[in-house]
């Protein structure tokens, strides 16, 4: 028992040090990114257009992913894991596929109605046609980042429950690195380079998470074979998700 306690304590210290290191890395790379933002983008109308296109998918990320993952998905997943781990794995993928569908649909709507969205949320851009069109082009590129970051939140939550803390805490570092590299390499097209770097970073994050999830023997499926057994859990999830969505939406 004494040896087991020492082992568990050492694991906690190791996980804490990994998370702390990644948080520090995120702060440092974020600081460097912001310096390069100021240097290459400056403070002008086009930079305002990029910041709008950058912030909108992140706003939806906070509404969809952050609150619902911590307060809704994780407790239900942990509970199902205790009952039946195989069915719990199907629960993961049902929720994963649900978020994929809803974020893909939202991205499609933004693609179709991006001009109307900008007119509604940033009416000041209407005063300058070039800024408005620039923001429109950037938003069409950046908004699908919501798909990757939301799906990454689902898989990160699973890894955290399984005690795998390194990659989930490293994801923001990956995004910052891609944005930094894009700014350095594509100086003349910095705004569009940053927009595309978000998509490439999001895709990279998701691939790495899939690899890590696969390493603990959790593989993608439709999850539909367990839909009957999970009906109660799914009802709870969607009910709580709706409440979380309304609460997060009001706050944002």
Where are these regions (language model features)?
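Membrane-embedded alpha-helical bundles of multi-pass transporters/translocases
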Residues: 7-252
């Amino acid at each position: 028992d004494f040896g087991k306690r020492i082992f568990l304590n050492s694991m906690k210290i190791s996980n804490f040090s990994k998370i702390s290191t990644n948080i520090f890395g995120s702060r440092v790379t974020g600081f460097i990114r912001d310096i390069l933002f100021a240097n290459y983008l400056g403070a002008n109308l086009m930079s305002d257009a990029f910041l709008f296109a950058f912030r909108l998918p992140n706003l939806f990320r906070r509404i969809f992913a952050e609150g619902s993952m911590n307060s809704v998905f994780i407790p239900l997943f942990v509970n199902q894991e205790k009952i039946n781990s195989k069915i719990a794995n199907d629960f993961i993928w049902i929720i994963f596929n649900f978020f994929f569908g809803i974020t893909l649909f939202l991205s499609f709507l933004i693609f179709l109605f991006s001009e109307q969205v900008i007119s509604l949320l940033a009416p000041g851009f209407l005063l300058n046609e070039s800024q408005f069109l620039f923001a429109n082009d950037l938003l069409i590129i950046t908004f699908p980042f919501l798909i990757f970051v939301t799906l990454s939140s689902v898989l990160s939550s699973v890894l955290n429950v399984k005690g795998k803390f390194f990659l989930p805490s490293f994801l923001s570092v990956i995004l910052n690195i891609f944005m930094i590299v894009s700014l350095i390499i594509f100086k003349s097209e910095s705004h569009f380079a940053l927009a595309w770097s978000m998509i490439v970073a999001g895709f990279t994050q998701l691939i790495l998470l899939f690899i890590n999830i696969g390493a603990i023997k959790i593989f993608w499926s439709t999850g539909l074979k367990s839909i009957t057994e999970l009906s109660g859990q799914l009802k709870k999830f969607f009910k709580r998700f709706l409440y979380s969505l309304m609460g997060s939406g009001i706050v944002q």
